């Protein structure tokens, strides 16, 4: 008998059908000489510190660096600590028996770093010695599964992939466990979760937040002139210079207005070619789904995974935007399939030769770029269909012709002031016709030449203010994670740097969600805004190595080198252990940043503890309560007296100087709600508000 192990029951069911394992047993399918079982994610994980006899957060125990990591069944948190999940334990027993009764194991977990780790951890935990081979496929269509089963690969081929996954898992454990315990011990209150990837990610969100909030707008003035354009239209020039003071701008405006004409000093015309966009990888799909449709990164990943399991798209957790030659041979057939869908009628040219910009086998790692499979997309929800059509539409774009534009840049002088205008006209829409972008308004520039005199139809002066960089959205944060914070727009260059980013396409959504779940940031429409807790953590760690984005990018680069067999995993692990010791010492030493003072106030929630000042937070010293009150509220820090008033009366007096997320100033009362969270009450509504957080 051969045992096939899949990552999920749904995938196991499809494989079982194909190999003839039609008899359903507890935890597996059987038949045709096969047993097909599943793991439903990680059945086995690294033990928590108490698995090594270390309990609680104790300074002298740090850093916790096991000589050998212990594997245990997946744990669930209970009131008495972490316990093995009973359902997981049952499934492990089933898998162990099947492994030992089999002549061969076929590994059909997801074909990637994490899928490999799921199997290898389970294999080592069970103590199994049965030989195994790898089913490595990029889609779950019947055709792909059958071809994969005919071309099984040696299990040892993916040893380096496993070593990279193992190194990632152990490094995350070392940094997360030791960093969290060290910072929490230093703080003396509460739990502050830190991590190898989550903390640098939070640092990028907080740094952008403060850059935005501390930005001082500068006023400027700009001049504009208008003259006759093409087809009875008007062409508007803008001054090359902007003036900080209105007076000189007004003087020049009057001179320009009096002049009545402008002289062309330079006229440049060029043909501009816009290359087709590359196919989607997961991160690019997530970014565009967030920008265009408001989907979260996690939502897009969940939908893409669902579409993959329905056999509609290829493997979603890919970091490549390219396909190899053998897949390119299938593209004409796939494009014909897409062209027959109602959404894309008339968008695919039947006999056109697909362009090759997205074809490069050397840039394909575990999996190629996202493609549709040719299975009909039936009965999809609105959201699922949106993501499916995004993948289909991008395929049409990627294999269409280039877009060709005629561009013009004209410079003119009037009364000593230089004005410029830029325009373009699409000559060949190419890929831009897929979404109708060729119909967007264009600026056609007449055939002016140097020395031509232009009669002014009007002139104007506008006033504006410089703007800060906007707060991060999930799309911009994903971009920053992809390039370790570097601002890079070029798609090809971003791909070249993808090994230096933080996180992987498969993990970035989970990292972002972790920051939400741990209360470090929240969504405000599309923007990501750090909470008081997130800003408090950032203020402590922002100059430390734990928050160093570039260094975290180097770790990811080294993990990719392990995967390619270019770096021994032991070398990486020794470096991570040394780093763990450094950051543990660094975080433990920051207890001075958490200096403690007694507020003199009883806890309004439990009535027994005393509220203690710890820098940016005030917290109850009763371990069973631990009520936190953050000083920073809407860009304003509450004073000691204001905090004491809040703790004593349940609310402050009306306070000035708050600033909204949109940058608008406002006055408000800070009060406790019924759950002792702080909230704003506005003075004009004070009489209708009942304060629920008064002192007991």
Language-model region placement:
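Intrinsically disordered, low-complexity regulatory segments
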Residues: 1-169, 173, 179, 349, ...
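Amphipathic alpha-helical transducer elements in NTP-driven molecular machines
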Residues: 9-16, 33-36, 40, 59-62, ...
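Metal- or metallocofactor-binding catalytic centers and their adjacent structured scaffolds
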Residues: 243-280, 286
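C-terminal or mid-to-C-terminal helical accessory/interaction module adjacent to the motor/catalytic core
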Residues: 87, 142-227, 269-270
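Basic, low-complexity terminal or inter-domain segments flanking catalytic cores
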Residues: 2, 81-83, 125, 180, ...
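Short glycine-centered, acidic/aromatic-flanked micro-motifs in structured strand/loop junctions
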Residues: 109, 287, 317
């Amino acid at each position: 008998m051969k045992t096939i192990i899949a990552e999920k029951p749904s995938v196991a069911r499809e494989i079982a059908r194909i190999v003839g394992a039609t008899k359903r047993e507890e935890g597996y399918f059987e038949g045709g000489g096969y047993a097909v079982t599943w793991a439903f994610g990680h059945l086995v994980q690294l033990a928590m510190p108490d698995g090594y006899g270390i309990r609680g957060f104790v300074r002298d125990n740090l850093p916790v660096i096991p000589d050998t990591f212990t594997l245990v069944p997946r744990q669930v948190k209970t009131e008495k600590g972490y316990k093995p999940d009973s359902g997981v334990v049952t499934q492990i027993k089933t898998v162990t028996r099947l492994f030992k009764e089999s002549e061969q194991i076929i590994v059909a977990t997801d074909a990637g770093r994490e899928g490999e780790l799921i199997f290898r951890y389970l294999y080592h935990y069970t103590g199994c010695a049965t030989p195994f081979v790898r089913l490595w496929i990029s889609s779950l269509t019947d055709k792909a599964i059958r071809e994969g089963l005919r071309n099984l690969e040696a299990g040892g081929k993916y040893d380096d992939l496993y070593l990279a996954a193992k190194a990632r898992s152990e490094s995350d454990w070392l940094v997360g466990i030791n960093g969290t315990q060290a910072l929490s011990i230093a703080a003396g209150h509460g739990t502050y979760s830190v991590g190898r990837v989550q903390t640098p990610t939070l640092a990028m969100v907080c740094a952008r937040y403060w850059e935005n909030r501390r930005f001082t707008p500068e006023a400027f003035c700009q001049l504009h002139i208008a003259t006759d354009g093409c087809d009875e239209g008007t062409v508007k020039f803008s001054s090359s210079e902007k003036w900080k003071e209105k007076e000189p701008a007004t003087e020049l405006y009057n001179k320009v207005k009096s002049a009545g004409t402008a002289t062309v000093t330079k006229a440049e015309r060029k043909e501009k070619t816009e290359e087709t966009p590359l196919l989607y990888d997961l991160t690019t799909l997530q970014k565009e789904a967030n920008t265009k449709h408001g989907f979260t990164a996690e939502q897009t990943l969940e939908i893409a995974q669902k579409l993959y399991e329905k056999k509609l798209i290829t493997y979603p957790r890919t970091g490549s935007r390219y396909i190899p030659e053998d897949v390119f041979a299938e593209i004409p057939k796939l494009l014909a399939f897409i062209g027959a869908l109602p959404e894309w009628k008339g968008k695919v040219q039947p006999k056109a030769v697909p362009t090759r910009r997205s074809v490069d086998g050397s840039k394909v790692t575990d999996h190629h770029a996202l493609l549709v499979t040719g299975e009909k997309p039936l009965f999809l929800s609105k959201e699922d269909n949106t993501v499916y059509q995004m993948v289909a539409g991008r395929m049409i774009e990627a294999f269409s012709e280039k877009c060709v534009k005629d561009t013009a840049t004209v410079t003119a002088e009037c009364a000593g002031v230089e004005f410029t205008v830029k325009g373009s006209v699409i000559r060949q829409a190419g890929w831009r016709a897929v979404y109708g972008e060729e119909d967007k308004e264009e600026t056609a520039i007449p055939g002016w030449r140097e020395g031509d005199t232009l009669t002014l139809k009007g002139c104007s002066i506008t006033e504006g203010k410089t703007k800060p960089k906007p707060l991060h959205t999930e799309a911009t944060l994903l971009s920053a994670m992809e390039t370790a914070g570097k601002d890079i727009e070029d798609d090809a260059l971003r791909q070249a740097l993808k090994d230096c980013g933080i996180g992987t396409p498969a993990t970035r959504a989970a990292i972002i969600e972790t920051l939400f779940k741990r209360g470090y940031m929240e969504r405000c429409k599309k923007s990501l805004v750090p909470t008081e807790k997130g800003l408090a953590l950032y203020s402590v760690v922002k100059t430390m190595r734990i928050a160093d984005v570039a260094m975290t990018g180097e770790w990811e680069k080294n993990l990719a080198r392990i995967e390619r067999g270019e770096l021994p995993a032991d070398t990486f692990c020794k470096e991570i252990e040394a780093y763990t010791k450094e950051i543990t010492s660094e975080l433990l030493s920051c207890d001075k940043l958490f200096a403690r003072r007694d507020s003199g106030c009883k806890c309004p929630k439990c009535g027994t503890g005393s509220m203690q000042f710890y820098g940016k937070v005030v917290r109850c010293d009763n371990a069973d309560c631990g009520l936190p009150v953050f000083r920073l509220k809407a860009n304003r820090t509450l004073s000691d007296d204001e905090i004491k008033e809040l703790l004593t009366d349940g609310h402050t007096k009306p306070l000035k100087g708050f600033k909204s997320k949109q940058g608008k100033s406002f006055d408000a009362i800070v009060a406790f709600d019924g759950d002792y969270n702080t909230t704003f009450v506005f003075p004009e509504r004070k009489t209708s508000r009942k304060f629920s957080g008064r002192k007991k």
